[in-house]
Regions:
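Polytopic alpha-helical membrane-helix bundles and their juxtamembrane interface segments
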Residues: 1-35, 39, 83-92, 96-210
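Hydrophobic/aromatic-rich structural module bridging two neighboring secondary-structure elements via a short loop
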Residues: 43-96
């Protein structure tokens, strides 16, 4: 309790942004849980909030990730709204989806190439951090950033297993943000970790049956 009082007694812009990020994150999570296309709108707003926060705390890879989030949000919205190829594959054209992409499983044929791409991203981001920044946590920062990039792509493809990728990211980020003294964001990611399990189960129920 004393720690909470101390936290608010020295209220700063970074702490205010930390709280704003918490609220936006909860809204985003609810929309993702419901598989609502509007999650991509929040995905454009959140990077502005979190980008400042991560830069202020020296999480440079996470800061760079926010630029990717904005671009991925545009791509994700387009994929969910207008892609029809997998709707044809799953014979889900008769469902009331208004042309939106259906939820499907992560194809086994993509596991190996996506894994290799993820490892390559991790290595490149790690090298960038240790070469050009003063990051104190380059290994964890680069890992969560690389895996987040893969997970966000999987979300744009509307694969149910994207939740499992986020489960790993969120668990690691929770510990990382506690270490970096960003308590509200740490609490948000702890909640994300739990919701990733529930979200995965929810999305499995939404996969079209043939």
């Amino acid at each position: 309790m004393e720690a909470i009082v101390q936290y608010f007694s020295d209220f700063t812009l970074v702490k205010a942004i930390d709280m704003a990020g918490l609220v936006l994150g909860l809204i985003y999570l609810w929309l993702e849980f419901k598989a609502s296309i509007w999650l991509w709108l929040v995905s454009v707003i959140m990077p502005i909030v979190h980008g400042y926060l991560y830069w202020a705390r020296g999480l440079y890879a996470d800061f760079g990730m926010e630029v990717y989030y904005v671009l991925a949000a545009i791509y994700g919205y387009a994929m969910w709204r207008w892609s029809r190829s997998r709707a044809v594959e799953t014979q889900d054209l008769a469902s009331p989806s208004n042309g939106e992409l259906p939820i499907t499983h992560f194809p086994l044929r993509r596991v190996l190439p996506v894994t290799l791409i993820g490892l390559a991203l991790w290595a490149v981001i790690y090298w960038i951090l240790i070469t050009f920044t003063d990051s104190s946590v380059p290994l964890c920062d680069s890992f969560t950033t690389a895996l987040s990039m893969v997970a966000l792509w999987a979300l744009a493809q509307k694969y149910a297993e994207q939740w499992l990728l986020w489960l790993v990211v969120d668990a690691v980020c929770t510990v990382l943000y506690i270490y970096k003294q960003i308590p509200f964001t740490a609490c948000l990611y702890a909640f994300y970790t739990v919701m990733a399990v529930l979200g995965y189960r929810q999305w499995l129920k939404k996969i079209p049956t043939t």
